Amino acid sequence: MDFHVMTLFPDMIMDGLNTSITGRAIKSGVMSVTAHDIRDYSNDKHLKVDDYPYGGGAGMVMRAAPVCDCYEDIVKNIGKRPRVIYMTPQGYTFTQKMAEDFAKEDNLVILCGHYEGIDERALENIVTDYVSIGDYVLTGGELPAMVVIDTISRLVPGVLNNEESAETESFSDGLLEYPQYTRPADYNGQLVPEVLLSGHHANIEKWRHEKSIERTKKYRPDLYEEYVKKHSDEFR
């Protein structure tokens, strides 16, 4: 899978993603990340890409031309017009289901805004998906873009060592993940649940499922209610 990030800070993107699991996946060729510097498409001798907003107001707005020209260059290089995710607090809140949908694409473009935003005409021309990682404002779209890429990349075949891990983590089935334990079995009097030491796989799976439900009900009642609606037979 190929990610293309349109940004004013390409080093921030690459430094953040060239480590850990995503870094390993990039080095192995399972996925690629290219940070496209929007400033490279400015016709200003100082590579300026912003200007004052029409109608007045605080801050600056990113101009349409550099953004659109950057996108068209990506289209030219990959040979098609891919989906474009614009990271914005005004977008739909990012979820695991959205990540699963995006993971079906061969190419994804992620647009990172800055200043007071981007000229609306650029957004109308190229953006297909408006996505937010939460109801708060950051200084730019780079950190949200990395969150989105990290989440999607875990669903790309070959990125994770254990193919099952992406399927059993929190949210994959609408529930939070069950508690995890490792050695020693006794840590200062705190014991690992006996069922996990039993070797009885059916009982272990039953325990894990029950704990996932308990944890979801306690920490994410909204998800719990949704799960109950979809699995009403389980609670009769």
Curated annotation (Swiss-Prot):
Keywords: Cytoplasm, Methyltransferase, S-adenosyl-L-methionine, Transferase, tRNA processing
Membrane-crossing segments per the record: none
GO biological process: tRNA N1-guanine methylation
An MF annotation (GO) of this entry: tRNA (guanine(37)-N1)-methyltransferase activity
Enzyme class: transferase
Residues reported to bind S-adenosyl-L-methionine: 113, 133-138
Record EC number: 2.1.1.228
Domain of life the protein comes from: Bacteria
Principal location class: cytoplasm
Catalytic activity: guanosine(37) in tRNA + S-adenosyl-L-methionine = N(1)-methylguanosine(37) in tRNA + S-adenosyl-L-homocysteine + H(+)
Family from the record: Belongs to the RNA methyltransferase TrmD family.
HAMAP family: TrmD (MF_00605)
PANTHER family named among the record's database cross-references: TRNA (GUANINE-N(1)-)-METHYLTRANSFERASE
The protein's name: tRNA (guanine-N(1)-)-methyltransferase
